[in-house]
Amino acid sequence: MNNRVRLAVRNSLCVAALALVPAIPVGAQQSSYPPPVNFTAEQDHQNMMDQLGIKKLREGPSGDEKAPNHANYDESLANPYPNLPDPLTLANGQKVTTAAIWWNERRPQIVEDMEREVYGRLPKNIPSVTWTVLVTDREYVGFTPVIAKKLVGHVDDSSYPLIKVDIQMTVVVPANAKGPVPVLMMFGQSVLPNPTQPPQEDLDKINAALKTLLEQQDPSLKAIFEQYPGYSPVPSQVRPFTPRTPGTPVPEPPSTQVLIEHGWGYAAINPASIQADNGAGLTRGIIGLVNKGQPRKPDDWGALRAWSWGAARGLDYLETDPAVDAKHVGIEGVSRYGKAALVTLAFEQRFYMGLIGSSGEGGAKLSRRNWGESVESLTGTGEYHWMAGNFMKYGASEATFGSKNAGDLPVDSHELIALCAPRLTFISYGVPEMGDAKWLDHQGSFMAAVAAEPVFRLLGAKDLGVTEDYRTAKMPGVNVGLLDGQLAWRQHDGGHTDAPNVKYFIDWADKFIDAKYVPETPAH
């Protein structure tokens, strides 16, 4: 656990009481700090172009196949840079033949290239995080009783009080578990699953007291309440039972329910509470706090790396929770959060496993592939904030350094997957017909997984079992899982979600957990 992170568990009633204490004016203290720079995304984007000496960027492809600049979906044109960087060759040309050479030499080289050119570096001066449990509640997920905790991780802002960062996380575990349980941390909204409601008698008292208070503030409300005697300011949250129409299919339960029913827990962490998902927010959030409200430098971290840092801080808390099996915590996300989940698993070796959903460019997709989403998609004003500023160089058509493209990248996504080895890495996609767009390049992501296989094998893990060269390897059929090794692949028949693969992920991961598989990494 990061020894800079201080963990605190406080009674939620004390927190509520403190909220009632008048705040001490801090205007005089804060006036000595320069205010954060207020850039639009376009202004911040231009600022980075100026720093890099970029005069013009190539336009990214359109997802509309009828547009003049539509993305390529012709496989014969998809591999303009067919030869990938070899993850098992050192920068000096020497081959990596042992695990020791990988851990001590090659892996650090890949990490350096990834940090400098693609995702950005973690600053050395990131403030500490203090976790507080705001609510502990006994609830139900489906028909399973659970213990749910709502937490906030406050980032120390004493170095720059003008920016506040409070990480939102919810942790839910089965109430009747016999011991600590595996937990899947999921990027998404942090909400309690089904908060316990007061009985009707108590709810009536709450409403009566609330009506009295409202009438005291505004006497005219008395007549309104008398006109509508059945109205309650706080309605019951108990949902009425709705019978299912005969003949309609039974809907699949949500992923969180599937996890709980299999004896797992989950933690929902809100990325927006860590770093905003836009370029205008780069002088705010954790990136802005560390930079004291100033714009980024070219190798500073982007939002994907910031979200992954927040997930690691969430893991700091989970390591202190006796209900959590902290040695078996995974990370999950879909789409942009699938990118973040893969980045998290690659850089934070304490995570035992990852479910990487529909991650596309910047995630599992090979950047060197000319198919759908491209490097240029991530260098424009809409998505550049996910990456390090330096990544914009690879979309440049005119610059002081000339021009660069995806073929100039020192690394590619197969090496990001390789950084996860030998830990459990499950690559998940759906099908275009159901909404998991061709844009994501399912084939290119599969090729990346195949190209990462040698690293898994070198480190004593089992790979996908694909023997073909990554250049010619073809995806297995839909709903055909490659689930025998620590590196796994499955394309389900649903849309832009990993929900249909969650039950397969759990069974696959349980196999290794039950076998007491311990990845041989420096973290262990």
Task: Describe each model-derived feature in a short phrase.
Residues Q29-L122, W508, V518-H524:
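N-terminal pre-domain segments of enzymes
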Residues Q168-T170, G179-Q189:
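Short beta-strand element of the alpha/beta-hydrolase
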Residues M185-T320, G360-N370:
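Cap/lid segment of the alpha/beta-hydrolase catalytic domain
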Residues G333-L345:
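Glycine-rich nucleophile elbow surrounding the catalytic serine of serine-hydrolase chemistry
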Residues A421-D441, H492-G494:
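Conserved strand-to-loop "acid loop" that flanks and positions the catalytic carboxylate
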Residues P432-E433, V450-H524:
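C-terminal catalytic histidine-bearing segment of alpha/beta-hydrolase fold enzymes
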